A protein has these predicted regions:
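Bacterial N-terminal signal peptides
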Residues: 9-19
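A contiguous strand-loop segment
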Residues: 26-126, 159
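Compact, glycine/acidic-enriched structural inserts
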Residues: 61-76, 115-158, 327-336
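Extracellular Ser/Thr-rich, low-complexity/disordered mucin-like segments
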Residues: 369-392
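Selective detector of the "anchor" transmembrane alpha-helix that sits immediately C-terminal
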Residues: 387-408
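Cytoplasmic C-terminal tails of single-pass
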Residues: 411-479
């Protein structure tokens, strides 16, 4: 009986862990430091669904709003940038920026981190910035990693976590990597509401969970392994970290720019998740939709869609980032007709309207006599966490499994009594009398299968709609 109850507890623990697992991306990022100061950063974007990604060109001198709700951060762009923007909901508009490089060679990459915790909204009036605008703020405001680290060491800006995706089921648990043209890097994570920053040229690899300090410990045992060592090959974050570190360290120190870019792309493909492959029990492990490589030395930004055999790129040296030049964009994730240099494919577009928290949420009703606060507001602590619709079938599975395991235990009183009798002293055992055998209880199996297919349609965000929202502030690139 004890063993059975332990089995029940184990099953419940596993199922609850699945219920609490967030659907999120499992991306990877590396930075190659070559001879003569060459710096090239690559990343992969792994996700359960397409972001319908576009490349956007943002000019200098453009007024921006960080979509943070109350006390939302506003700023004027100091640097032009090429960024990857997409939809946080497959049926919604383009409302987030996840990756990119500015004209100074600063690169920013937003990746998933399950342990991320931005903390509760502050009671003071500090500026607030939507997590969907975090990359944009960094790339259009700073030139070096030192400047970024200084800006986020003192939490003068609150990064607002906003649930997104279908039904708002996805949690914005992310961390940020930044790399500049000198090769300096930083990993910025928010844990327990406070920024934790790893700053230095040595931080060349980043994946996902666990937290970065734990990733470094896990990777340490693989340092200095020879080329005959069998590397871990799963799609788990820790395994991707090991492979990325190993192959990055074994890339040739070439001065050939083509070979250098090819080397970084090859590492990113090695840690990518094949198309259509994932872990159904862990929705945070999803196929790779696209890869990017940003050359901070030549200022060329490359993009590769998993569904296209063509690599495209933008040379930032050829883009007009002058104030008043306007925002331009081109679809890249699902645009199969483009190839090679696409500088001229960038067409006028409206600026991205970033994902923002719901405006003016209704105040909860005061609880009456005999009414709890959760009854008055219509919420519970569990519903506040926003598990999403998918926990319902999992919850039913929990009930079914527990019922199947407990039912046989409750139907065995005769066996229990017989066992107790056999353990009693021999002198106390009465003469045996014939006992009719108890009817055998046949095993029962219950199974349930539920399959559904959701056809998601997507309407591309109209490019070129709306007027340019910006004012001229400067005619030159600041130092």
């Amino acid at each position: 009986v004890r063993i059975s109850y332990r089995v029940i507890a184990a099953v419940l623990a596993v199922l609850m862990s699945v219920m609490l697992a967030p659907a999120a991306n499992a991306c990877s990022r590396v930075t190659w430091l070559g001879p003569d100061g060459a710096v090239i950063t690559g990343r992969s974007m792994d996700w359960p669904y397409s972001f319908h990604s576009h490349l956007y060109a943002y000019p200098r001198g453009l007024e921006q709003n960080g979509a943070g709700g109350i006390n939302s951060l506003t700023w004027t762009t100091k640097f032009g940038a090429i960024v990857v923007a997409g939809t946080t909901d497959p049926e919604g508009p383009i409302d987030g920026i996840f990756d990119g490089m500015n004209e100074a060679g600063l690169v920013a990459n937003l990746l998933y981190l399950g342990e991320s915790d931005f903390g509760p909204a502050p009671a003071d009036d500090r500026p607030r910035l939507s997590f969907a605008a975090w990359v944009q703020y960094v790339l259009t405001s700073f030139k070096t990693v030192d400047e970024v680290v200084e800006a986020f060491t003192d939490p003068a800006i609150y990064v607002v976590p906003i649930n997104f995706g279908p039904g708002g089921a996805a949690k914005p648990t992310v961390h940020l990597s930044v790399t500049d043209a000198s090769g300096d890097s930083a990993i910025i994570e928010y844990l327990d509401g406070k920024p934790v920053i790893h700053h230095g040229r040595q931080y060349q690899v980043m994946t996902n969970s666990p937290t970065y300090d734990e990733q470094l410990k896990l990777n340490a045992k693989w340092d200095n392994v020879d080329k005959n060592t069998d590397l871990p090959g799963s799609i788990q974050s820790a395994d991707r970290f090991v492979r990325a570190s190993y192959y990055l360290n074994n890339l040739p120190q070439t001065t050939d720019q083509r070979q250098a870019v090819a080397g970084v792309f090859s590492v990113m493909r090695n840690v990518s998740v094949p198309w259509g492959v994932g872990d159904p029990e862990h929705p945070n492990l999803s196929p790779t939709y696209w890869r990017s490589v940003a050359d901070s030395t030549t200022k060329i930004y490359y993009f590769e869609s998993a569904l296209s055999p063509n690599i495209v790129w933008v040379n930032l040296n050829n883009i007009n980032f002058a104030p008043g030049s306007g925002v331009r964009a081109v679809a890249v994730e699902e645009n199969y007709s483009i190839i090679g240099n696409i500088d001229t494919e960038l067409k006028p577009a409206a600026p991205v309207r970033f994902l923002a928290p719901p405006p003016n949420p209704p105040a909860p009703a005061a609880p009456g006599p005999g009414t709890s606060e959760s009854d008055a507001t219509g919420t519970t602590e569990q519903s506040k966490k926003g598990f999403g619709w998918w926990w319902i079938p999992v919850g039913l599975a929990v009930v079914a499994v527990v019922g199947a395991l407990v039912r046989p235990l409750s139907r065995r009183p005769v066996e229990a009594a017989t066992l107790a009798a056999t353990r009693a002293p021999i002198a106390q055992v009465p003469p045996a009398t014939p006992v009719a055998p108890e009817p055998t209880i046949s095993d029962r199996q219950t199974s349930a299968a539920d399959a559904s297919s959701i056809q998601v349609t997507y309407e591309n965000n109209a490019l070129g709609e709306g007027e340019q929202d910006g004012t001229d502030k400067s005619d030159s690139v600041p130092d």
